[in-house]
């Protein structure tokens, strides 16, 4: 496989309503993903935004479906179930949670999430140990490193 193909994000448009993911700026971390059909995410509920796209991420990465900050701040919309493995080739649906008290209308062509390509360690060796090396933090979790 050539270097250029292994670093490619291959996108399949599954209908005439599907759109290729785009970046909002040249240095944006994520690619905006678009809804291919209208829909409603009910108040305090959840639903799936249809995209009519499939994609294969570059070698050594996985796709993380992340929220769009504007939807989160203005409408209380968050994403869920956001891991797309390299070997998944089906349609990518976007799980959306509506944390607001108003139904959220999705229109065809709306940007509903962003795709972030993250590097992964493939085939990490799992080693069972009796104990872990002590660290300054130790077992402290959830807010243990400070107040703010």
From Swiss-Prot:
What's its catalytic activity? dUTP + H2O = dUMP + diphosphate + H(+)
Residues binding dUMP: 69, 82, 85, 88, 137, 142-143
Q: What is its EC number?
A: 3.6.1.23
Q: Which InterPro entries match?
A: dUTPase (IPR008181), dUTPase-like (IPR029054), dUTPase-like_sf (IPR036157), dUTPase_trimeric (IPR033704)
Q: Name the cofactor(s).
A: Mg(2+)
Q: Which molecular function terms from Gene Ontology are attached? A: dUTP diphosphatase activity; magnesium ion binding
Share an example GO biological-process annotation for this protein.
Answer: dUMP biosynthetic process
Name the UniProt key words of this record, in alphabetical order: Hydrolase, Magnesium, Metal-binding, Nucleotide metabolism
Enzyme class (EC, first level): hydrolase
**Pathway note:** Pyrimidine metabolism; dUMP biosynthesis; dUMP from dCTP (dUTP route): step 2/2
Pfam families linked to this entry: dUTPase
Q: How does it assemble?
A: Homotrimer.
Family to which this protein belongs:
Belongs to the dUTPase family.
| Role, per record | Involved in nucleotide metabolism via production of dUMP, the immediate precursor of thymidine nucleotides, and decreases the intracellular concentration of dUTP so that uracil cannot be incorporated into DNA.
- The name on file for this protein is Deoxyuridine 5'-triphosphate nucleotidohydrolase
Gene behind the chain? DUT1
């Amino acid at each position: 496989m050539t270097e250029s193909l292994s670093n490619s994000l291959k996108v399949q448009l599954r209908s005439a309503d599907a759109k290729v993911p785009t970046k909002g700026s040249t240095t944006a971390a994520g690619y905006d993903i678009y809804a291919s059909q209208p829909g409603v995410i009910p108040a305090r509920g959840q639903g799936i935004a249809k995209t009519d796209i499939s994609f294969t991420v570059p070698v050594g990465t996985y796709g993380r479906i992340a929220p769009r900050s504007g939807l989160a701040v203005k409408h209380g919309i968050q994403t869920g179930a956001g891991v797309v493995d390299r070997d998944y080739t089906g349609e990518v649906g976007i799980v959306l949670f509506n944390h607001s008290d108003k139904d959220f209308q999705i229109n065809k062509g709306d940007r509903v999430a962003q795709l972030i390509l993250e590097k992964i360690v493939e085939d990490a060796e799992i080693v069972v140990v009796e104990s872990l090396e002590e660290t300054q933090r130790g077992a402290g979790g959830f807010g243990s490193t400070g107040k703010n």
